[in-house]
Amino acid sequence: MMGEAVYEVATRLFDASDLRALYAIEEACFEPAVRFSRSLMRSLAHDPNCRTWLGIVDNVRVGFAMVGLRGDEDASAAYIWTIEVLPAFRRMGVARALLMRVEESTREAGCAAMELHVSERNADGVALYEAAEYVRMGVEAEYYGRGEDAFRYRKAIL
């Protein structure tokens, strides 16, 4: 399944039967030092102010996105906690499909903007967000620890 093919990606909201798949995707995507803990993932997945969307190709869960809904004094904003795709399915439209679904669902929920952090070392993530017209708002030093900074992005979606 390698290459630059673009798959037809279905998206759907998380349900409790997906939790093990989320753990497996997280383990495939990140080294232990930077993974979300299982308890944090479980908490976010079940949080009523968080939406977890799955990316599915040929009935296989190949990625997911977690977004938190929150409000501030000016407008409602959503925060993308993570978008993760199994390595064998990267650069094939899965992350883009998840990002589009997240934007659509948060816009429907009344959110005016999306915000996120992405590692300065994550060139594919940076390219994804910039292609989707996210604006780099700054750099947060040591955001991920170990000398790894994060770019902070924001996009108006209303």
Predicted regions and their residues:
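Conserved beta-strand-loop-alpha-helix junction that forms the acyl-donor binding cleft
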Residues: L116-V126, E142-G147
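Short, Lys/Arg-rich nucleic-acid/phosphate-binding segment
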Residues: D72, E140-E142
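Terminal substrate-recognition subdomain of acyl/acetyltransferases
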Residues: M1-E4, E142, R146-L158
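Conserved GNAT acetyl-CoA-binding A-motif
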Residues: L99, T106-H117, L128, E140
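Active-site acidic-Proline motif in GNAT/NAT acetyltransferases
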Residues: L86-M92, E120-R121
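Conserved active-site tyrosine of GNAT-family acetyltransferases
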Residues: Y129, Y134
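Acetyl-CoA-dependent GNAT
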Residues: G3-A88, R96-R101, S105, A109, ...
